[in-house]
Amino acid sequence: MIGGFQSCFNRGNFCRRCCINYEDRNLPLPLSHIKVRTVVDHDKTVQEIKSNPNKSSLMGVVGESPLHELIGFHPILSLPGDLMHDFIEGVCPIIIMSLLKQASSMRLITYAGIQKRMENFKYGYFDTSDQPPPIQVKHLNNGHIVATAAQKPCIFKLFPIIFHDFIYHLPSFIVYKVLREILDLVLSYPFRKQWLPVLEDLCNTFNQIMILHFPTKIIPKAHFIREYERMIHDFGPSIKYWCFRYEAGHAYFKKIAMRTNNFKNTPKMLVTHYRLKQCFKFELRKFEVLALMHQ
């Protein structure tokens, strides 16, 4: 990993910003009671691992970062979390799936009814481009929402509208409402410093109600949400360093790989297609400029 941390999140000290243990993630510990990683402690840990090759990892650290010689870089200070993976592809789909399963267990709606509701829902003009596929019965059985990173926020945002007739009967709907407020704040740009205490209170509340309503669904990303107040304080608005735009580029290359059906030297093939696309765009701009000049 680029920071020299362990790549496994289901054991040990999985967090890169504090020293919480995986077994303690379900405990109602205030964030102020959890030891924060510091530059000095991290450097000592790295030196201890280098001096003892038999240690595979220590406090979630597996070794020195490949970028340790880069001026101004340090794994503790230079690696903020990613809003897209923590919220949009992490906790949000889990909460939606948990609420739908709770509604089914309370006999408010069946799995088949959920699928039919999603298939018949009419999306608005601004949501049609990111219209998600319907949540099918097999997805509910597997506990996994099949959608892209752009489609999952659409499901999360429209969830109270699609299932408006029974959501207020769910005892755990408060989890969705608090998470929705947190998401609205972390997506804000510009982000005002006066909002940081509000975000901190919401994140602490979210942790408490998750322990109360969905204790088995507290994954490491649910803990990462608690640290967004510190993260935004240190790095600024979270949408300035999220991976959403990189995912868009990744989707383009996946489409090219599937459409060409060429599996020999795939990197060269992808680079060639992308360079041709860029050349076409640049030449098109030249023609547009010439056309304007002649006019």
Describe each model-derived feature in a short phrase.
Residues C19, Y111-Q295:
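Terminal interaction-prone segments of large eukaryotic proteins
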Residues M1-Q151, I155-L158, F163-D165:
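Domain-level detector for long, ordered catalytic/regulatory cores in large eukaryotic signaling
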